[in-house]
Amino acid sequence: MNPKVIFYDGGCADCQKVSAFFSAHGVDYDRKNIKAHPELAEDAKKKGAKNFPAVFINNDIVEGWNENALRAKLGL
């Protein structure tokens, strides 16, 4: 599994911002749609997520749209 994974809801504005941010910075990542596959939300919650989007970068979680936290975790 890619060490960078976004658990997202397809209609979520913050989810779209995170995906756009990753794409704009050339970050390779996997996307897990929790709306289409609700079992993925349970998987993310078991790993510590409380809110979505939940971005897992290695073993760290960034929840919601937090550009500064994403930059710090990605070394940008």
Give the positions of each predicted feature.
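Non-catalytic, surface beta->alpha helical segment in thiol-disulfide oxidoreductase systems
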Residues: 58-76
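Structural micro-motif
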Residues: 47-55
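Local sequence-structure signature of Cys/Sec-based thiol-disulfide redox active-site neighborhoods
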Residues: 1-25
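Thiol-based oxidoreductase modules, predominantly thioredoxin-like and allied folds used
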Residues: 27-40
